[in-house]
């Protein structure tokens, strides 16, 4: 609950929607304490609504089209299912258009079932699923976060409390190959930073030279 709200909002928007969410390190799910969600919901929705989408040769656009018809069908199907699911609420976005290119609006879905497939499946697109937990349920939520998805490439923790950052990072050691503190999940600097995943996302074997040995 002690996080910097502005930094968190920027990280969620950029982490989820840069490159249309089509990068391996994109943020696809977020677990937010209820007190934090209440503080940032309006700003998060507004910032997402403000994102422009269109021709990538026009540098005023933040997003372009998703890569192909199969990706579009996967994203459109997931959004249609979310709209029909009483456990889900579309906070912003949700529209798709394939008349010219394969465009998927940046979308945030509020999910009230922590075992929902939106929190475990990898859509690889501009869809951010958010689960809001009660502030006092942090330990149970960390267990959920650690156990829900088979993928474990990147993650991020936001807090001004250094002790909390250290405790949570240790608890989630196997939940992400690259775990960022107070920064969005992103790519690595090849040859300078270890980058890789855990579990279904690999074993830190992609870049970073001898630094990869630090995991063991």
Model-derived features: where do they sit?
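ALDH superfamily catalytic-core signature
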Residues: 1-114, 132-139, 143-147, 181, ...
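Conserved C-terminal structural/oligomerization subdomain of aldehyde/semialdehyde dehydrogenase
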Residues: 2-3, 52-53, 64, 96, ...
């Amino acid at each position: 609950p002690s996080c910097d709200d502005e930094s968190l909002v920027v990280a969620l928007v950029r982490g989820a929607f840069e490159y249309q969410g089509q990068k391996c390190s994109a943020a696809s799910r977020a677990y937010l304490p209820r007190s934090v969600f209440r503080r940032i919901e309006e700003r998060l929705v507004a910032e997402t609504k403000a994102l422009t989408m269109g021709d990538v040769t026009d540098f005023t656009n933040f997003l372009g089209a998703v890569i192909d018809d199969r990706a579009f069908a996967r994203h459109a199907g997931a959004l249609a299912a979310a709209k029909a699911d009483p456990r889900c609420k579309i906070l912003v976005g949700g529209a798709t258009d394939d008349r010219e290119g394969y465009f998927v609006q940046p979308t945030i879905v509020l999910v009230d079932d922590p075992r929902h497939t939106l929190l475990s499946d990898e859509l690889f697109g501009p869809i951010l699923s958010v689960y809001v937990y009660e502030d006092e349920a942090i330990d149970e939520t960390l267990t959920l976060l650690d156990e829900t998805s088979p993928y474990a490439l990147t993650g991020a923790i936001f807090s001004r409390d250094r002790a909390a950052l250290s405790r949570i990072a240790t608890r989630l050691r196997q939940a992400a190959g690259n775990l960022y503190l107070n920064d969005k999940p992103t790519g690595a600097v090849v040859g300078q930073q270890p980058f890789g995943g855990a579990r279904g996302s690999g074993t830190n074997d992609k870049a970073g030279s001898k630094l990869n040995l630090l995991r063991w």
